[in-house]
Structures are given as C-alpha cells and as structure tokens.
Design a protein with these regions (language model features):
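Conserved catalytic core of the tyrosine transesterase superfamily
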Residues: 1-320
Length: 320
C-alpha cells in the first residue's frame, strides 16, 4: 500500500529546513556552539573586527552570507589580507591566531550546514613562542601592591578580593571576570578553566575567602549575577571586563611604584614562580595551582626561574 504524503507535514519540514540554513540562523547557531561563554564573546568580537576592517560594516547576517558565498580563492585572499592587516597593527601572535580561529570556526560551522563551499585550512596560524617571558615580581613587591588598597571603601574591597584571587590561586584574567556570585561557596570557588566548558571547584585560602566575603557584604546581588562588577558611573553594575581588570592591576602597580608593567597575566606568572621557589621546583603541584594542561609548560617556568640557560652558557664560556 502506497503511503499518502501529508502536504502540511512536508510544508512544515521544508519550512524548518529552510530556516535552519537562513542567514541569521547560521550566526545564531554559531553563537550556541558548545564552547565556553568567554570563547563565544571572544569569537563574536573577533568576527565583528574582521567584518569592520574588511567591509567597514559591523557583523550581520547579510555580510556573513556574502562572505560564505565567496569562491574559495577569493575567500582565502580576503582572510589572508585581514591577517596582513593585523600583523601591520603589531598585534601579538596569540591575538591574531584567536581572530583567525574565530573565522575558521564560523566557516567550519557553515560547511556542516552545506552553506559554505570553501575551507580555510590552508590559512596558517602564526607560530607562537611559548612563554617567552615568565618573569614576574617578588612576593614582597606584590604585598606592597595589595597593602596599599583601601579596603574600607567599596572599590577597595572589590580590588583586594580580585588581587587575592590573582595571586593566591594564580587565576587567569578570563577566569576571574567570568565568575558569578553563586560560584563562591564557602571554602571553594567554581571556575571555568581555559578551553573548558564545565566548571570545576578550586579550594580557597582563608585570606581569599575573607576577602570575597567582605566584598559580597557590600556588593549584594542575586546568585546568577556577576561576582565582580564595574563601579564607575558609565558602566556601573555591569560585569567587569577583562580590559578593565587589566587597567586595575596596572593602576595598583603604578600606585605602589612597581617598576615592571603589571598585568593579570604577569601576576599569574609571579604567583606560579613564587610557588616553584617555595616548593623547590615542584612542577606537579604547580600544575594543580595553574591549571596548565601540559606539564611541559611548568618545566619552562622552572627552567627560567633557575636560569638554566644562563648557567649552561657560563659553563660553555669557561671552556674556551
């Protein structure tokens, strides 16, 4: 017996299928990929930069469709031209590679939907020298920085809590700014590590717990709201951005007359190096602190901490 097709069902399925490959759907679904919220924000910003630089217009479904419909040679030429522009701006290899990764991710997603006929696999990323500078500041210098914070003020309580997390737990900038109030639970903090989606718990020292509790005592807010917020008039109450966190660390370092230019990442380097000094080079424990995926990264820290290369060069120099 031949089944009679239901035109209503066919029409509905066809409508759904067409909507799934619509211009705006590609962009919407791309932002729902199983990547961390931080990566989503980073990719969205990177793609916007790509379209603004190459077309003068912010990212939108129409621009995405035009790009995805380009012949392969033209699409690759556009992306290579964009990479050249980024190099001319003297951006770091990591920054350039992140922006290229965002474009490649969008193209790969569109290819899965059969909405793109080219690949960007031949667009090479820039070679990055891993952890060229792992130097930081000594613990006594960092102590001067945080002791100068006026913890009697609302801003001071926030800044002190942030600075304790950066040092005591060697957190990355993105790990701090992504925190919500509900992520702080008694003696633990739930964070999203770099490249991960699921949160994991880390233990907090007593000083860190106290600093967070004192900040929350004046911050208030619902559990789902950002743990650290902007306090200036223009952005009050919004999640503290990574850029603002960088300015905060830099300002505190300048106030304390620290000679080195400080950043959240340099604080992280300082913390990891200080623990390696304290533990006589226990790279396995340092890995638990830092959340580095590869143990080899901590070996680089330890070798440079001990100036292994300098010692080797001195021994060779003594031979001739």
């Amino acid at each position: 017996m031949t089944e009679t097709k239901n035109p209503l069902i066919d029409s509905s399925i066809g409508s759904i299928a067409r909507s799934l490959v619509a211009d705006d759907h590609i962009w919407t679904e791309f932002l729902k990929l199983q990547i961390s919220d931080h990566t989503k924000r980073t990719y969205a910003s990177a793609l916007n930069d790509f379209f603004v630089q190459m077309t003068g217009v912010k990212v939108n479904p129409h621009q995405i469709r035009e790009f995805l419909n380009l012949p392969s040679a033209q699409a690759i030429a556009v992306v290579l031209s964009y990479r050249s522009r980024l190099l001319a701006l003297n951006l770091s290899p990591n920054t350039i590679n992140t922006r290229l990764a965002a474009i490649k991710s969008l193209v790969n997603h569109a290819r899965k939907l059969s909405q793109c006929g080219f690949s960007l696999a031949d667009v090479a990323s820039l070679k990055v020298e891993a952890y060229r500078d792992t130097s930081g500041v000594e613990p006594n210098v960092y102590r001067v920085m945080i002791e100068a914070i006026d913890t009697e003020t609302v801003g001071g309580k926030r800044d002190y809590a942030i600075m304790r997390l950066l040092w005591d737990n060697a957190l990355r900038r993105s790990e701090v700014t992504a925190l919500n109030i509900e992520d702080f639970q008694s003696d633990k903090l739930w964070i999203i590590r770099k490249g991960k989606i699921q949160k994991q718990a880390i233990d907090l020292a007593g000083k860190t717990r106290l600093a967070l509790a004192q900040w929350l005592g004046v911050r208030g807010g619902a559990a789902s709201q950002p743990l650290f917020i902007a306090l200036d008039n223009r952005a009050y109450g919004k999640r503290l951005s990574g850029r603002s966190l960088g300015y905060l660390v830099e300002r505190l370092a300048q106030d304390a007359d620290v000679e080195k230019r400080m950043s959240p990442h340099r604080v992280r380097h300082s913390s990891i190096t200080a623990y390696l000094d304290l533990s006589d080079g226990n790279v396995r424990d340092a890995r638990l602190l830092s959340g580095h995926a590869k143990l080899e990264t901590l070996v680089i820290y330890d070798d440079r901490r001990k100036n292994v290369q300098g010692q080797v060069s001195s021994k060779l120099a003594d031979l001739v």
